[in-house]
Amino acid sequence: MTLGEKIEQVVTGRPDSHVPARVLQRLTGLPERPGTQPLPVNWAMHFGQAALLGVLRSVMAQSGLRGPVASAKFTVVRLTNDQILENATGVGAPPTTWPRTELAVDVLHKAVYGFVTGAVADALAARNGPGPGERHAARRPGRHADAGPLPRQGR
């Protein structure tokens, strides 16, 4: 996502966003200042959120929630996480108030993150074989309302 953002910024001339730093400053009580924010604070929030939410995508994959549909769901979680933090701290405004181009760029970058993270998480989880959800679905392929749970393992 970061590489894609940097390429997009070169092409569009869009400046760096300091929203991640401002959110972290408000969450932690760090002092705020106008204008450009310290790069380490910006990156700490940027990469910290990515790492923490990446764990969630890994849990999804290990559980058997894999593939593009799971990555799309995760992308929504990633977008929602940003909006909760930005709006709760007063740093951001609801996306419905943003210019459409800014909204499109944000959604695009989060989608890249969501699908790349999903591909990596899915590949790593696949090394352990099907997840519990996939094993359950394989017992009776298709859509069924009466699919009971898998038996407990090790008992």
Task: Label each residue range with its predicted role.
Residues 1-155:
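Short amphipathic, positively biased membrane-proximal segments
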